[in-house]
């Protein structure tokens, strides 16, 4: 919940940095290729007396190695940019509970968790601060809304405070079903798709 919005914001902030890094990488790529061409030309002339075929093979080998080196450099810079963006995304995730829209995000995560375990008698686990946000009247309203949606009596009992950044964990009373919608668990579950989205937007 809210992951796409956060990702888009961080990716937008990272674009300038990415452009700079990639520009440097491209310049280095050109320098590598230019140097390789000069080296190839020099060696080609040096061994020209041995035969045109040998000279051409040497030239092609040097250029192929240079292209491979340049490609490797670009891939390294791309991964570096993605990693920096992910780190910024994680930093922003930690700050999310301080934002005005966080309560709405938290409510949606609770509703999603209740849906995933199927309602009924449930235990709601939050961090200490979020238990202050979800007061008894909010909890009652959530129960009523979920009963109407699921057509099933749903009771949300507050459990112990957990050491999570934010979000929620929902458990059935018999502990057989658990929905971990903590912010960190949600981030980890979506890490591959977030990486793909960052790569798509930046490159």
Curated annotation (Swiss-Prot):
Gene Ontology terms, MF aspect: ATP binding; proton-transporting ATP synthase activity, rotational mechanism; proton-transporting ATPase activity, rotational mechanism
Keyword Membrane recorded: yes
GO (cellular component) term, any one: plasma membrane
Keyword Membrane: yes
InterPro entries registered for this protein in UniProt: ATPase_E_C, ATPase_V1_Esu
GO terms (BP aspect): proton motive force-driven plasma membrane ATP synthesis
Membrane topology, as annotated: Peripheral membrane protein
Keywords: ATP synthesis, Cell membrane, Hydrogen ion transport, Ion transport, Membrane, Transport
Chief location of this protein within or outside the cell: membrane
Localization, UniProt: Cell membrane
PANTHER family (alphabetical): ATPASE H+-TRANSPORTING V1 SUBUNIT E1A-RELATED
Family: Belongs to the V-ATPase E subunit family.
Subunit structure: Has multiple subunits with at least A(3), B(3), C, D, E, F, H, I and proteolipid K(x).
UniProt function note: Component of the A-type ATP synthase that produces ATP from ADP in the presence of a proton gradient across the membrane.
Protein name: A-type ATP synthase subunit E
Record organism: Methanococcus maripaludis (strain C5 / ATCC BAA-1333)
Primary gene name: atpE
């Amino acid at each position: 919940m809210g992951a796409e919005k956060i990702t888009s914001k961080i990716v937008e902030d990272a674009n300038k940095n990415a452009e700079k890094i990639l520009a440097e990488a491209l310049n280095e790529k050109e320098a590598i290729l230019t140097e390789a061409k000069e080296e190839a030309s020099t060696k080609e002339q040096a061994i020209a007396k041995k035969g045109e075929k040998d000279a051409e093979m040497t030239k092609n080998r040097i250029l192929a190695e240079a292209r491979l080196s340049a490609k490797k450099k670009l891939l390294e810079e791309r991964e570096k940019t993605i990693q920096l963006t992910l780190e910024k995304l994680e930093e922003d995730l930690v700050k999310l509970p301080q934002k005005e829209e966080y309560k709405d995000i938290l409510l949606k995560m609770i509703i999603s968790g209740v849906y995933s375990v199927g309602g009924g008698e449930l235990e709601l686990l939050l961090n200490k601060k979020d238990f202050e946000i979800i007061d008894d009247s909010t909890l009652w309203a959530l129960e009523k809304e979920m009963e109407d949606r699921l057509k099933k009596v749903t009771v949300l009992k507050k459990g112990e405070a957990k050491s999570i950044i934010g979000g929620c964990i929902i458990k059935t009373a018999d502990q057989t079903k658990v929905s971990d919608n903590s912010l960190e668990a949600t981030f980890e579950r979506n890490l591959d798709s977030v990486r793909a989205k960052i790569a798509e937007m930046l490159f």
